[in-house]
Structures are given as C-alpha cells and as structure tokens.
Amino acid sequence: LETGGSVNYNYKDADIISKQASETFVSSATSSFKNAQNANRNKTTSLTADFRIEWKPDTMTTVIFRPRLTYVKNDNRSATNSFTFSQDPEHTTDEILSAADNLSSLIPEENIVNTIARNSLQKGDNFNVGGSAMVNRRLGKPGRNITFRGSYNYTNSSSEQFSVSETDYYQKTEEERLEILNRYISTPTLNYNYGARFTYSEPIFKGGFLQFSYYFQYKRSKSDNSTYTMPNDWEIAQGYGGDNVGVLDEKNSKSAQYTYYNHQADVSLRWIREKMSLNAGVSFQPQKSKLSYKKDQLDTVAVRNVFNFTPTFDFRYKFS
C-alpha cells in the first residue's frame, strides 16, 4: 500500500486605488472631461487537498484512488466616484473629490454634466470535491486484462452581489436630476458529473490485441440568477433578508439547468511489429442533452439526441 498527497492554503489581499483625468473629443469643436477615482479591495482564501492511494493486493491487481477537495472564498469591494464636465475643470482629481459634497462651489454648475457615486460588494464561496479511481486486473495470459476507471466531481458555489449607485444629472430638471439604482443579485450554482469506463483487452495473435471499451458519463448543471431592486435608502452594510428585501426584477432574473447523457462504445484492433503498427476500429457515440430555461415569461425545455459513428484506421511502416 502506497499513499501520498498535499495540502495547500493560500490567502491574497490586494488593495488598489487608481485616479484618472481624461479628455474625450466629442467633435472638432467640443470635448468632454472626466475625473474619477476607483478603489478596490480584493480578498481570496483558498484551500486545496490532493491525495493518492495505490494498493496492490496481489501481483495481478492494481487499485489507484485519487480524491481531491477545493474550497475558495472571495470578498471583492469597490468604490467609484466619477465626474464629467463640458469644460476643463482646471482642478486635480483630489481637489474635485474633496469638494464632491458641494461641487458647484468649486466648478460652475453649467459646466458639470453629471457625477456618479457607486459602491459594490461581491462575495462568494466555491466548494468542490471529486476523485478518480482505477482498478486493473491481469487475467493470466500476457496482454489479457480488464480495467475499470471511474470519476466523480461535485461543485457547489454561491455568489452575492450588492451595489448602490447614485447619478446626479446637473443639467436636467429637479424631478429628473437624481437617478438611484440599488441592486442585490444572488447566483447559486450546482454542478456534478460522474463517469465510468470499462476496458477489456484480449491478445489474439503475436503482437495483436483486440480491445473492447464502454464509457458512460452523466453531467448536470443548474444555475439560478435572481436580481432584486432595492429601496433608495438601502445600504450594502444592511445586507439582504429580514426587513431588507427588494422587488424581484423578472426581466433580469433567469434559471437554467443542463443535463447530459453521453455513451461511447469502442472496438479496436492493434497490431504492433518491429517495423509496422496497425490500429483500426470503430466508435459509437449516442448522446442526449436536455435544457430547462426560464426567464421572465419564457419557460422552455429543449431536448437533443445525437448519434456519432466514427471509424478509424492508422497504419505505419518504418522503411529503415
């Protein structure tokens, strides 16, 4: 019995602040000026564990098992302040930021197009567990063996996005001037698949082997995206739930589920000699997929069946 493995832990914390002052030429006679600051704080924590177990109960049998586990947690925050002007503000971004609460005291109001203040938080968890196994058994005669290979993978992830945005259009009427858009988006995702392959190899003459193989795979993926419009006085720190709930935005919410059934059966002949090699066979691949999709008034199910037939022939000869 042989065992081995590794465990890795990683933590990243990035704090980035960027400032910009730009001019965009709208036409040959007019320009648009923009000053902005972006502040981002991104944190990532991850844990990965891999193991390998090999067991040989006798000289004819080999068993290998490779389990693995991964966990990742993200926390990404950003704050953006941008200011757009019809004339050169003639002030630095820092000076404009300092006067943001009373910007017209620094720059004539007729030169201010709009100001945008936006804060966002995206946090998520991703848990993955999977593994593979292989069992090989030699059956007496050299070259005769049977092999089983299996794999499994399961992923469960969730993502939450919180955002508050306030845009002030200085040149609009008092009723139209302020635009507030607060949103909460939840996106849980579930993926899992498993597969199994059986292979049998039979020697039929010197250097020649006949091989039979069958493979089956099942995959399923489900994702729900729910978008909520939150009240104007809502703040990110309040979170979502309890008294802090919003109105479901059906046009921007959707759910999708994919299901796959894949089969593959192979028959092949391999003949290997000192100066030549021959590989000929045929593969049959029936497949079925199903999609269930919902968005707003759309609720649909699509099923697809495919059958692939693939013959192969490969002959090589060494002349020297």
Segments from the language model and where they lie:
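Primarily recognizes Gram-negative and organellar outer-membrane beta-barrels
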Residues: L1-S320
